[in-house]
Amino acid sequence: MEQPTSSINGEKRKSPCESNNENDEMQETPNRDLAPEPSLKKMKTSEYSTVLAFCYRKAKKIHSNQLENDQS
């Protein structure tokens, strides 16, 4: 990675991705996974299961006028 690149004037220079000082060390990237995920065994579970119910109306009422006409 430290291969010098040639410029137009014939001068040798380092590639732009290298640091200015050769003695500079790369800083380690911070570990973003510091907070461990909770395991499935430790998660709280409820004593009762949740039941979801919904009603489906087969005959849909489009307008109130149509409902009045159907009843007559």
From Swiss-Prot:
Region (Disordered): 1-44
InterPro entries, per database record: SPAN-X_fam (IPR010007)
Family membership: Belongs to the SPAN-X family.
Protein name: Sperm protein associated with the nucleus on the X chromosome N1
Organism: Homo sapiens (Human)
